[in-house]
């Protein structure tokens, strides 16, 4: 349920207040105080709504109301309060004695907004208008910097392709030079020879080593070349087919010796 109306609208006057109504309302409030605005019109003998009586008293008939223009100090106070409170005109009016919220609101919209704009200040945010433009310029420059970074990335991506193209050109030039001068080669005209290695696999039974006996093979070296392990003939040490004179040990026809290729020591 909503609030009941403060008066009967059928028996109330509307429109501008007359001087007689102002005098009657002023005399009643001076004698009895403000009291309840719902019952005040009937007690004062006025055919007005309680809300209309309240607004007429607060905005026009109060004895402490200030008449005339706003001072420079009041202008600065209104600007400072508006920057803190915003459009809460009733709170701003409470800090300016003798001024009403409706009066301050009208004065703000007609005078103070223009004054702040002429100073280069935004009347809504109370910040310099030039700073807003500077912020937009900073945003634009930041976007351009991002574009530059992307362009730099594209350039860095293109550098490996250029390096590969340069390497291909150098390789083509070297090949062409070798074809035109066949005598100039890395081996000075001599073909490179790979050492002959015996890649045949041999299977040998497991060897049981005595921990008390040194099992290191004895290698015979002649003129810096390893001949083989003692106990192997020359043919077996070089991986050649066995001759009729081979007396190397064997087990069920399987060779039990390991080959020694040039006695290479692996560390």
Swiss-Prot record:
Q: Which residues bind DNA?
A: 37-61, 89-112
One Gene Ontology term, aspect cellular component:
nucleus
Keyword Transferase: yes or no?
no
Q: Which tissue types show expression of this protein?
A: Germinating seed and apical meristem of shoot and root.
Recorded coiled-coil stretches: none
- Please provide, alphabetically and separated by semicolons, the GO molecular function terms listed in this UniProt record: DNA binding
**Disulfide topology:** none
Q: Which UniProt keywords apply?
A: Activator, DNA-binding, Nucleus, Repeat, Transcription, Transcription regulation
Task: Identify the domain of life.
Answer: Eukaryota
State where the protein is found: Nucleus
Extract the Gene3D superfamilies matched here.
Homeodomain-like (1.10.10.60)
Read off the Pfam families from this record: Myb_DNA-binding (PF00249)
Family matches, as CDD domains: SANT
Q: Which positions fall inside the HTH myb-type domain?
A: 9-61, 62-116
Q: Tell me if Transcription is a UniProt keyword of this record.
A: yes
* Record's function text: Possible transcription activator in response to an external signal. May be involved in the regulation of flavonoid biosynthesis.
What is the name of this protein?
A: Myb-related protein Hv1
Species of the source? Hordeum vulgare (Barley)
- Which gene is the coding source of this polypeptide chain? MYB1
